């Protein structure tokens, strides 16, 4: 039994300093596939919108937008409407990256680089609002509170926000993958113990691997994936709102 990371599918050799060669990985390919599918789905939902006699498709689109608006307003207030597209994009991309494994593709959220990229975006926004609200000098002075020797701990506290967000999401998704894999191999061993004494091809029957792993996979990919997307977006709204204060 092996648990491997994303494979490198192709390498583009470059002479760019520091950047080095560009590696096309399973994570990158799957992420672009998810983005293409989400873009196509959004375009399909937004076609031929009407003010009256709306279709079920338009009603579904309006429901999604209304729920997203309410989610952001409840967590951040009405002064942060400009972040509704960002929160919606992160939520949709997180769910899409989790569910893509259902059709046999590599899940980008099983790669820490994916969550780290999202967390860095959130961290930049947090730093922007802290500096905008307090001023850069006041922000730097705050890192020295209550005494200057606390500066390293305060800096570590700032950096821990994106790190904890990334590892929380990644860890939960990875744990689901590990549990599903262990269950699959445990059921294979159980099938071998029960049917291994039968003659011929009957001894190769993997009865217990049929159905049960699929249900556990659906739980971790669908339910667990949606929960993690919700938690990540909730933390995003809370941290940005806290950094912005009462803007």
Regions found by a protein language model. Name each.
Residues 1-247:
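Selective transmembrane helix interface/packing segments
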